[in-house]
UniProtKB/Swiss-Prot annotation:
Quaternary structure and interacting proteins, as annotated: Interacts with RBG1.
Record-given protein name: Uncharacterized RNA-binding protein YGR250C
Pfam assignment, any one: RRM_1
UniProt xrefs under CDD domains: RRM3_CELF1-6, RRM_SF
Record lineage: Eukaryota, Fungi, Dikarya, Ascomycota, Saccharomycotina
Keyword entries, A-Z: Phosphoprotein, Repeat, RNA-binding
Native source organism of the sequence: Saccharomyces cerevisiae (strain ATCC 204508 / S288c)
GO molecular function: mRNA binding
Amino acid sequence: MNIAEEPSDEVISSGPEDTDICSQQTSASAEAGDQSIKIERKTSTGLQLEQLANTNLLTIRIKWQLQEEEDDHCNSRITDQIMDTIQHYKGISVNNSDTETYEFLPDTRRLQVLEQNKDIYLYEHGSQEYEKSYKDNEEEDDWRYDTVLQAQFKYPKSLENACTDISELLKSEPIGQHIDKWSIGVNKHALTYPGNIFVGGIAKSLSIGELSFLFSKYGPILSMKLIYDKTKGEPNGYGFISYPLGSQASLCIKELNGRTVNGSTLFINYHVERKERERIHWDHVKENNNDDNFRCLFIGNLPYHNPEKVETLITPKEVIEVIKKELSKKFPDFDIISYYFPKRSNTRSSSSVSFNEEGSVESNKSSNNTNGNAQDEDMLKGYGFIKLINHEQALAAIETFNGFMWHGNRLVVNKAVQHKVYNNHNSHDRHPSISNHNDMEVLEFANNPMYDYNNYTYDRYYFNNNKNGNSNDTSNVRYFDSVRSTPVAEKMDLFYPQRESFSEGRGQRVPRFMGNKFDMYQYPSTSYSLPIPMSNQQESNLYVKHIPLSWTDEDLYDFYKSFGEIISVKVITVGGSKNKYRQQSNDSSSDNDLPVGSSRGYGFVSFESPLDAAKAILNTDGYQVSKDQVLSVSFAQKRGNLSSSDDDDQSQTDNSSKFQNFQPHNDYHKAYPTKYNKKFINALMTQNQSQQQVSRENYFIPLQYPNTNTKPVNSYNLISANQNNANWMMPMFPSFGFIPQVPPVPYIIPPQNPAANHIPIMANGSNEEEEFSSGDYSMDY
């Protein structure tokens, strides 16, 4: 196991996927004389932990009066009263074994320890002294606190109320007689489990034993989990490690983050569960979309080149320096918590920007080559986002830099508004934005049920509508989450099942309720039929062509929001996605023919419900939005299925060769290949089941059959029918890869025919077969 002795940069983010949102970093081995770099580390690197902070921590430290042993029950009674107050405000107590040893030190010494280790104990950067019972000049160094109680609160208001009540409790006369000293501390940017870390970049050659030896040097390991590929059985190169204390995890991050082990560079960071990261993210979004609290700013119309230096590109470092230079005059503590300035390459690997110890810019691509395509890829897109310490500084930045002339460009700076994620995952846009947005009349369509969901969707990418920082109006730029989809190679015609899908076969007849309840299964001649996505199409993601070039993401969202809950919307622009596949077959123009930031005339809309997506296609495909523009709407192609239909058929043939040893028992399965999107079919079946909660008695209609051996029966679970029971029959459906579950249907079983055919039915795509007799009879009720 080889470990390269290299200085490591401290990075605080939620994982490798977030490395393009960079904090200002400095090397741990920076020279002591460079005070500016030290100050930068103290503020930016520490404050970046706010992106992961997910709880509010309360710490109560108590030193008891010297008492007889029989009076110890009084101390326990006081402790119980404190814990009752914590529970009253829904606080969660922290296990005593998870309490850091420095919490028992006198306050002055404890603060000295934190100051000396400020570059290590990053999780303590939000700690503040709330109140204490003695003055600083009364403190002595030869004592320790006897009891330390810690609790976590979800809401800052609960923390504040608990602090007030506990402070009054400790000051009360009966309790004060038993306490010598006490102090209360708070941390509104704490981690729930500061001992948990994420480890990325693990070389596949490293064994569990080697990893355990490497990480156990910083403390006992409670647990270690490596993630493996389920199909290949190989490690994915990342995992999770838990230490008992946050100080041990912080020391590990300090020493190993950025080190090269067995040829692979480690990325180590505090770990917060995905659900917690999503909650933190949306808390920040709510704050930023509130005009009274926002701290995140959009900066547009940035110049591409520095005219004072020939062929020199503008870097994020230069933008940050200009902002700091101006605003530090008003705010001595001014700082930028995080920033994001995308490059024209629009790839995560090349858009990641960091600072080395000399302050120069480093990226995954060489910035020395300023010629040809390399220069274009390293060039910024002309816009970015920054997050400041507080709202007051954000307002000052807008006042100072909105309209500020820099290298011949007039900057556009305003509040970065993140759109609500859609229907109503969040109501983010409740307050008017500083930006000006054109309102578009919401179109009303038929068959547009609205659903009310309160779920959140994690939004990891920022986008804006105008990608050109040097032209056009950038005042209406917003950022949205991405629609991670792949364009279809050409327009896909909407597919409606043919009549043969439910034609009457030997010994069967289609149950009448199927045609009545499942609109999508009705014949094309009916007035209302839902389109069905194929297996190589996405069930909830729409590809919309021929949209007006003036439409933005918000306009496209407003157009479709009446159909149901929308997860994300994206209008594709020049200079945006570099996907080599184009949605339009006639889209052969190069980016040089169009201004950067202009719309390509197509986009994506991702719905939460597949049925809402189908209804949107039904209502808007062929819809005339203007005199010369008619929308063309279809299901988006799945990633990796961008070839023509012929190629797709060939790929399916190739895939099917894996199962060449499997031969269907009859021609029925050959006639109905699995080409429908299974998730869509499942959603359709689920909706039908919820609408048809019919009891057994409602369907059971006893009928007289000429033969006395005939028995009326009901089928309640078409999949789990008992093949040994001659009274069970299963209706035949097209092979969707599974047997759809439907409400109970009565059938009349005729006398058994010894010569009846046996038709195998594949249940849920498994290899287990269930055989059912199919005599010459018809089903009715």
